[in-house]
Curated annotation (Swiss-Prot):
InterPro entries with a match to the protein in the record: Band_7, Band_7/SPFH_dom_sf, HflC
Keyword Transmembrane helix: yes
SUPFAM superfamilies registered for this protein in UniProt: Band 7/SPFH domain
Organism encoding this protein: Vibrio cholerae serotype O1 (strain ATCC 39315 / El Tor Inaba N16961)
Entry membrane topology: Single-pass membrane protein
GO CC terms: membrane
Listed name of the protein: Protein HflC
Amino acid sequence: MRKLLIPSIVLIIAALLMSMFVIPEGERGIVIRFGRVLKDNNDLARIYEPGLHFKMPLFDRVKTLDARIQTMDGRSDRFVTSEKKDVIIDTYVKWRIEDFGQYYLATGGGNALTAEALLERKVTDVLRSEIGAREIKQIVSGPRNVAVLPENADSSELTTEAAKEAMEIDGQRDQIMSEVLNDTRESAMKDLGVYVVDFRMKKINLPDEISESIYRRMRAERESVARKHRSQGREKAEVIRAQAELEVATILAEADKTARVTRGTADAEAAKIYSDAYKKDPEFFSFLRSLRAYEKSFNSKNDILVLDPNSEFFQYMNNAKGAAAK
């Protein structure tokens, strides 16, 4: 009996150890019994949380699966737009296992590489459909994003409204990613037991053979808009300049008119003063006019006057008595 006791204890301990298994943190376990996933009362795969668990030795096999969010970097692939132009897009997908039983069966034993290959195929098919329905400029930009200025364009030459009109593009990049995420999430859950957490387009490139022609066309479009607004600006400048010149001419004409009126009023006032003075004392006024005539006549030493001494011009010089009286 003692000889059998020790082997029995060893067998019991071995069986106990073989029936125990530990699920690490961040993983989940499923038990495979006779090639089938062990299920619960709801006919769903029985999931073992992290910790210590027990199984039937020899009959059960434990498969641990990563329950954390995983990232799949998609390979660069070519897609054709609605303009029949090629674009090269790099993507990535974040996913996690949701239905571990379905995942195990769909991937042939829980192979992550197989899961990513199947998931990438689904993503590529949906993305190809979305890209084929849009133009390049819609694909590369987000909602109402501002596109890149052409190399030779000067944004300072555009007004704020003109620049906004010239540079705004109805970008649909975010919409594309949302559509791909929703469509892929539904089919991946159904077929693979995988929940797609996020999908992003990392990089969008143009093939070398078409990128230059696209850039030339975009530059031409932007330059055309810029020329249009510069032309409108010059027209407005000409209108403003003409209005300013008209206002200047009007102001100068009004000023000249006012000056003429003022000068005429002053001349009339002076003539009136002279007339009133003459009426008060005609002889004194005549004498004063003669003195001014003498001053102007004899102002220059080189002038020679040939006059009759008895003329009226010399009346105040010849008539001392009359001059004294004056």
